[in-house]
């Protein structure tokens, strides 16, 4: 098992991609903290995964919550070897309809949350003297703008840039910082996304999802499980020489 004895903190992991990562890490021998703003859901997920998982409340927009989360896990495990910054928020609107509230909320979760989670965990990793792995969740939306998701695109571009800067800054401490950039990933959130696109683009419900999947060279939308291999690899010693990179895992979407 490639992560035997390691401890991992995954934000926003009560469901979706974060949960898939947690399950994969446990299969590889790690202990995993299911950190989520929805503590009840986190507890349910941890119970389903088994004794190698624990649940912890975390609001990445609240510095006190971040500090409590890290301190609690250090008390429980003694170290945090892997951080996955997965918590994120998606929204869409034309430029002329973007609200200050939505803008601030997306940047608070997607950018500030990523930065200050990196900071808190990196401090613990440096103090522990063992280095570690930090994996940020970027997106293809961070590589190119899209008409109705301008703010989300900007937040994910910021995550890519932060990954580069943090990677260069922290490698001297033995901390590798890299990112994964998924393309379109299917999941329960897509029902709401599809409905919003339908309203803005005057499409029947389900049509945007069909269009998006058909445009992927692989032939379908991604699934959370498609990303787990990269998430495992970047957490292993095999990735020690990889620094400040963002990896596309998108079924060829970026090249299409």
Swiss-Prot record:
Catalytic activity of the protein: keto-D-fructose + NADH + H(+) = D-sorbitol + NAD(+); galactitol + NAD(+) = keto-D-tagatose + NADH + H(+); L-iditol + NAD(+) = keto-L-sorbose + NADH + H(+)
GO MF term (any one): galactitol 2-dehydrogenase activity
UniProt KW keywords: Carbohydrate metabolism, NAD, Oxidoreductase
Signal peptide: none
Description of how activity is regulated: Inhibited by DTT, N-bromosuccinimide and iodoacetic acid.
Active site feature: 152
Enzyme Commission number: 1.1.1.-, 1.1.1.16, 1.1.1.14
The keyword Membrane is annotated on this UniProt entry: no
Domain of life from the UniProt record: Bacteria
Induction behaviour: Induced by growth on D-sorbitol.
Residues that coordinate or bind NAD(+): 15-17, 36, 59-60, 86, 152, 156, 182-187
pH dependency: Optimum pH is 11 for substrate oxidation and 6.0-7.2 for sugar reduction.
Pfam family, one: adh_short_C2
Quaternary state and interactors: Homodimer. May function as a tetramer in vivo.
Function: Catalyzes the oxidation of D-sorbitol (D-glucitol) to D-fructose. Can also catalyze the oxidation of galactitol to D-tagatose and the oxidation of L-iditol, with lower efficiency.
Family: Belongs to the short-chain dehydrogenases/reductases (SDR) family.
Protein's name in the database: Sorbitol dehydrogenase
Gene: polS
